[in-house]
Structures are given as structure tokens and as C-alpha cells.
Design a protein with these regions (language model features):
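Interfacial segments of multi-pass membrane proteins
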Residues: 52-53, 116-127
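Short, Lys/Arg-rich, polar N-terminal cytosolic tail immediately upstream
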Residues: 1-8
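Hydrophobic faces of alpha-helical transmembrane segments in multi-pass integral membrane proteins
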Residues: 15-26, 44-48, 63, 67, ...
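Short, hydrophobic transmembrane alpha-helix segments
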Residues: 26-36, 56-58
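Single conserved hydrophobic/aromatic residue that forms the stacking wall/gate
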Residues: 147-158
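Internal alpha-helical transmembrane segments of multi-pass membrane proteins
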Residues: 84-108
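Structural signature of hydrophobic alpha-helical transmembrane segments
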Residues: 33-44, 80, 86-92
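C-terminal ends of transmembrane helices
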Residues: 48-58, 101-105
Length: 158
């Protein structure tokens, strides 16, 4: 029996690693061929760790991944418009992002980097759409597809 569990656990680890590899590969590839848009931001790597390695965690649920990223990026863009690039704008943006994720029950820790990226990079509202919303949606769809393929009897919680 131990051998059977050992094999199953290792297969799940391989599927998780392969899933993360493929997902970040495609996002990186799109980033390399699209000269007008940025597709890849560092928080996506952290999101993939949660989504692929601990997909049952409340923090890795599709709703949290998608809306956590959008709310956090929006917070950063808003504070940049209001206060520019300053220590207070970065601090307020991150605090506001945490507040929004808590009240909407969409906490996703990797998204906490988005307000900092938005302010330091002087990002506009377009940053929320591309790469944040587009990338987060890609990660969610990719992860749900992989979970459905590897565990066909598991319902897709969205």
C-alpha cells in the first residue's frame, strides 16, 4: 500500500511541476513575441506555486487568484494617480489592497506585489487589464484545465 501512495504522490508532484512549467512557459512566450504588451510579472510565479502545489488552499482558489490580482493592481494604479511614486503611496496602496481583499474574501498573497509594481513602474489602468487580469485569467483557466485532466471526477470550483 505504501508503494501505491508513494507513486500517486509523486505523480501529483510531477503534474504540479509540469503544470507550473507549461503555464509560465506560455506566459513567457507570449511576453517574448508581443512587442506591445507585457505579459509576465513576478507575482505570477508565486501564484503558480499556490495554484499548482496547494490548489486546495483557500488562497489558491480561482476567485482569489483573479480578483486578488485585479483589486491589488487597481489599488496601486489609484494611489499612483493620487499621490505619485512615494513611500506613502506604496504603503497606502498595499494597505488598501489588503483591505479590499479581506472585505471581498479574495485574499491572494502573491497579489500583494501588484501595487508596488504599479507605483514603481508608473503604471496606468491598462496595467490592470494587461498583464494583470489577462495573466491571472490565463493562470486560472490553465490550472482548472490541468486539475480537470488529472482529477476528472473532481468538481471545478469557481
Amino acid at each position: 500500500m505504501k508503494f501505491k501512495n508513494f507513486f500517486k504522490d509523486n505523480i501529483n508532484i510531477l503534474i504540479s511541476c509540469l503544470g507550473a512549467f507549461l503555464c509560465i512557459f506560455f506566459i513567457s512566450y507570449f511576453n517574448s513575441i508581443d512587442e506591445t504588451n507585457i505579459w509576465l510579472i513576478p507575482p505570477f510565479g508565486a501564484s503558480l506555486v499556490l495554484v499548482m502545489a496547494v490548489h486546495d488552499s483557500p488562497l489558491a482558489q480561482p476567485r482569489n487568484v483573479f480578483f486578488g490580482h485585479i483589486l491589488s493592481a487597481s489599488s496601486g494604479v489609484l494611489m499612483f494617480y493620487l499621490l505619485g511614486n512615494s513611500p506613502i503611496s506604496i504603503s497606502l496602496a498595499l494597505s488598501f489592497a489588503i483591505f479590499l481583499m479581506i472585505i471581498t474574501k479574495t485574499i491572494h498573497p502573491p497579489a500583494g506585489a501588484n501595487p508596488i509594481i504599479a507605483i514603481l513602474g508608473a503604471k496606468t489602468i491598462e496595467f490592470v487589464i494587461m498583464p494583470v487580469a489577462t495573466g491571472a485569467l490565463f493562470i486560472v483557466i490553465f490550472a482548472l484545465s490541468l486539475i480537470h485532466i488529472s482529477e476528472p471526477t473532481r468538481p471545478l470550483d469557481i
